[in-house]
Amino acid sequence: MATQWEVVIGLETHAQLSTVSKIFSGASTQFGAEPNTQACPVDLALPGVLPVLNRGAVERAIRFGLAIGSTIAPRSIFARKNYFYPDLPKGYQISQYEIPVVQGGQITIQVPANEKAGKPAYEKTVNLTRAHLEEDAGKSLHEDFAGMTGIDLNRAGTPLLEIVTEPEMRSAAEAVAYAKALHALVVWLGICDGNMQEGSFRCDANVSVRPVGQEKFGTRAEIKNLNSFRFLEEAINYEVRRQIELIEDGGEVVQETRLYDPDKRETRSMRSKEDAHDYRYFPDPDLMPLVIGRDWVERVQSGMPELPAAMQQRFVDEYGVSAYDAGVLTSSKAMAAYFESVVAKAGAANAKIVANWLMGDVSSQLNRDGIEIDAIPVSAAQLALLLQRIADGTISNKIAKEIFATIWDEKATDEGAADRIIDAKGLKQISDTGALEAIIDEVLAANAKSVEEFRAGKEKAFNALIGQAMKATKGKANPQQVNELLKKKLG
């Protein structure tokens, strides 16, 4: 990509709030129902109906605002955003324009290293402009209608929190890092389920380019409804290339809305991009101003979970894990909870081995089976006992991996599964010095060549002798004792 161009990106993210009912009606928000079975008279915009604000949606917006250090507006208003679309029965969307409920705020992101480009990993803070409440529209269905379009209004009225950043991101990598951080946060807070396939979390990317050093922004294009992190990255990268090539060929970028085609991996024009005045915003006369008192904010604050950044630091301070490990362990609330449950039973002294196992064998098995940590078939108590048996020398780490796989595969329910399997299979580690010395003497006698090579300065020969000793004990020997006894006997 040409280095004389600077990329400017701002994201607008729509997070469906996890309320049982819609933002202005009592209809269900459950996903997957038969079309138009969850649309009440308010959602259908029948004559004479009036909207009633869902308190739960407001509280979820407050929770988000508190988490990002924003200002919660003591008084905000709802506005009508006027436009025509078949899946918008009223002919307008109830949203917020002049006074949003959440104002400002920041999210810190970790941008991974780009080895191909020679760029190291770095941290960046993205400032948010606002987050406002609004209702979702219905959905147009283009299949199974013999060339016509069907309208499903089940989604109409589902509460959304639209989260808008400042145009501060300078690459697709930064945009994806921000989207992932935001996604993790709204799921952590319990305000959105984050299911991107179902449309619970989707992004619009505003992309423009300008010559390096120029202060004025270039003309932007908005790419709508990106519902995967991969699509977000691909769409931005394509759009940046398209705009640069267009300008360098003497053309001009036009302000427009574009869609991303994942099959062709390109964006295509959808319509000219509207400005705010095109929507003719005005206050909704059917809704009173939203007044949020200090006491309401404090009640929400009192129910806030510990935030990921604070938990990361606590894990470093309390359990002695590295900052990187703490970041991985707090990547989801379920992972953090499982870690602390295991540590509570295994003991804080074993926190580091717990962390290593969660990031190693446990994560590997989860990925293999395609499940999340909250569906793990090995309970915290079972894993804690297994790790205690490593710590007290009953079994080796290698044997522990075999036992873990057995507990996982048989979906054992007994807390003492590790001890049961150790006894049933005779897996206890050999730690008796006399027994180990006898085995090592046999190994040295049978491997005279390796002994000579070691004494000649070849370190690899020592590892070969350890391997033979472990083989002779079928992996049951205490590796540390084998190492020490070999060194002693070899002088």
From Swiss-Prot:
EC number: 6.3.5.-
Record's catalysed reaction(s): L-glutamyl-tRNA(Gln) + L-glutamine + ATP + H2O = L-glutaminyl-tRNA(Gln) + L-glutamate + ADP + phosphate + H(+); L-aspartyl-tRNA(Asn) + L-glutamine + ATP + H2O = L-asparaginyl-tRNA(Asn) + L-glutamate + ADP + phosphate + 2 H(+)
One Pfam family this sequence matches: GatB_Yqey
InterPro entries for the chain: Asn/Gln-tRNA_amidoTrfase_suB/E, Asn/Gln-tRNA_Trfase_suB/E_cat, Asn/Gln_amidotransferase, Asn/Gln_tRNA_amidoTrase-B-like, GatB, GatB_C_1, GatB_Yqey_C_2, Gln-tRNA_amidoTrfase_suB_CS
Keywords: ATP-binding, Ligase, Nucleotide-binding, Protein biosynthesis
UniProt keyword Cytoplasm, yes or no: no
SUPFAM superfamilies with a match to the protein in the record: GatB/YqeY motif, Glutamine synthetase/guanido kinase
KW Nucleotide-binding (keyword) present: yes
Gene Ontology MF annotations: asparaginyl-tRNA synthase (glutamine-hydrolyzing) activity; ATP binding; glutaminyl-tRNA synthase (glutamine-hydrolyzing) activity
GO terms under biological process: glutaminyl-tRNAGln biosynthesis via transamidation; translation
NCBIfam families: gatB, PRK05477.1-2, PRK05477.1-4, PRK05477.1-5
Family, as annotated: Belongs to the GatB/GatE family. GatB subfamily.
PANTHER family according to UniProt: GLUTAMYL-TRNA GLN AMIDOTRANSFERASE SUBUNIT B MITOCHONDRIAL AND PROKARYOTIC PET112-RELATED, GLUTAMYL-TRNA(GLN) AMIDOTRANSFERASE SUBUNIT B, MITOCHONDRIAL
Function of the protein: Allows the formation of correctly charged Asn-tRNA(Asn) or Gln-tRNA(Gln) through the transamidation of misacylated Asp-tRNA(Asn) or Glu-tRNA(Gln) in organisms which lack either or both of asparaginyl-tRNA or glutaminyl-tRNA synthetases. The reaction takes place in the presence of glutamine and ATP through an activated phospho-Asp-tRNA(Asn) or phospho-Glu-tRNA(Gln).
Oligomeric form and interacting partners: Heterotrimer of A, B and C subunits.
Protein name in UniProt: Aspartyl/glutamyl-tRNA(Asn/Gln) amidotransferase subunit B
Source species: Burkholderia cenocepacia (strain HI2424)
